[in-house]
Amino acid sequence: MNDYPILLIHGTNCRNDGKHHYFGRIPQMIEEQWKKCYLLYGDAWGTIAHNCELYRWQIKRILSSESCEKVHLIAHSKGGLEARYLVSTMEFAPFVASVTTLSTPHQGSRTAAIWEKRPLRLHFIGRFLEMYWRQRGDLAPDVVSVVHSLTPAAMAEFNQNNPDVPGIVYRSFGAVLAQGHRDYGMACLAHCLTHWDGETDGLVSPDSARWSKNHQLLSGVSHRDVVDNRRKKSHCNYDWRRFWYLLLEWLAEI
């Protein structure tokens, strides 16, 4: 059994700071069941490379303060790509025991490709989002670059440049929404994206979330509820406490 610290990496259009951080009640639960849990702080609309530069120094400080050899990375949505980039491109593999990704678009999003074909709209919305998130702490938001990086073509290149590193345990989880789900925002998005991406959790399709041989599909849960972002009952069979408890048990055996 190991007790390496657990580091949580957020996705796009959210930050890990502020009164209502990204992972809901999960950090408190991990602290109760585990030794240490840390939130990593990146830009809401930072590129993968930019956010990983921010994470690099945070991880080094954690390794030093905890006097530990390695950490576990648990990352949601685009954060899963950043976790893989840290290990492969930034050569953090010696300091990472495992990488767990939750609803991460490893194979890209057709919806992102559609947005890229509408550059005027994308630039207009991007300017608004960048202004908004700069006021909330983003250092270098870049919506257009982030959207491009999530297209299937860009992700194919990313996957080629960031293969799994031997010695690190990878695990991925995808999700798909159920009818009657109470996360109405994600349910609406899922309906809108059906034409391009098929079934999704509201943003990411199960096929895109698949990575590594160790993969599991969560049925009836939304993109946000995987990480308790809404802090509400998901009105399905998904029990976030049980899911995270089992995940911690699995990490303890690595």
Feature roles, as predicted:
Residues T12-C14, A44-W45, G80, P105-Q107, ...:
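Short, solvent-exposed loop/turn segments at secondary-structure junctions
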Residues Y4, K35, E69, P94-A97, ...:
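A structural micro-motif
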Residues L7, Y38, T100, R171-F173, ...:
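Hydrophobic/aromatic beta-strand patches that form the interior of the parallel beta-sheet core
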Residues Y22, N51-L54, V146, L150-A154, ...:
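Soluble or luminal CAZymes and related metallo-dependent hydrolases
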Residues H10, C37, E53-N159:
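Serine-dependent carboxylesterase/thioesterase catalytic core
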Residues P163-I254:
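C-terminal catalytic-base region of ester-bond hydrolases, centering on the histidine
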Residues M1-K70:
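Active-site catalytic motif of lipid deacylating hydrolases and related acyltransferases
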Residues F23-I26, T89-F92, E116-P119, L189, ...:
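Glycine-rich, phosphate-binding/catalytic loops in enzymes
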